[in-house]
Amino acid sequence: MRICFIAEGCYPYVVGGVSSWVHSMIKNFPNQEFILLTIVANRDASGKFAYELPENVTEVHEVYLEDVDWGSVNRHNKTRLNKKEYQALRSLILNHEVEWDNVFEFFHKKNISLNQLLMGEDFYHAVLDAYNLQYPEIVFSDFLWTMRSMYLPLFFCLMTEIPKADVYHAVATIDGN
């Protein structure tokens, strides 16, 4: 079985906490194949692992958030999403009946800059729907910019090639404060 761990800013770069748990899981299942999809700030972290990777880690894919290609927004050449693409985006933002196959297809096949997407009409309308349905007591401009900030790293990661695996597990810390 191929198991892909998706880890942001922890394993295999830093010791302790989530990283220790991931390392223990990999070592305790030597007959399973593990793939790491790591999300780090920039290329300075590339290959600088705090752990010696076990033999059953067969691939490490590093995603560098600093590599975001903003592109430019051309006001005369606005990119509009078709109905299926818009529904995929909207369902993701509303976290309602997300059709992941459509989401992945959209981010892998649509040639659009993150800047065009986040500053475009379609993202605006999907966020406006979320705002009206769930958060009308918040100042809309604050909500819109917060959503842009939150979705930028997710959209960037969705645009990268996801390694093939049988199981995907995103590891994270949970802060109770």
Provide a role label for each language-model segment.
Residues 1-119:
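N-terminal subdomain of nucleotide-sugar transferases
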Residues 2-5, 9, 148, 160-164:
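General secondary-structure edge motif
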Residues 12-14, 144-148, 167-169:
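Short, flexible loop segments at the rims of nucleotide/cofactor-binding pockets, characterized by
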Residues 22, 175-176:
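Short, well-ordered alpha-helical microsegments
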Residues 96-162:
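Long, low-complexity, polar/charged, intrinsically disordered or flexibly structured peripheral segments
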Residues 159-175:
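Short N-terminal targeting/anchoring amphipathic segment
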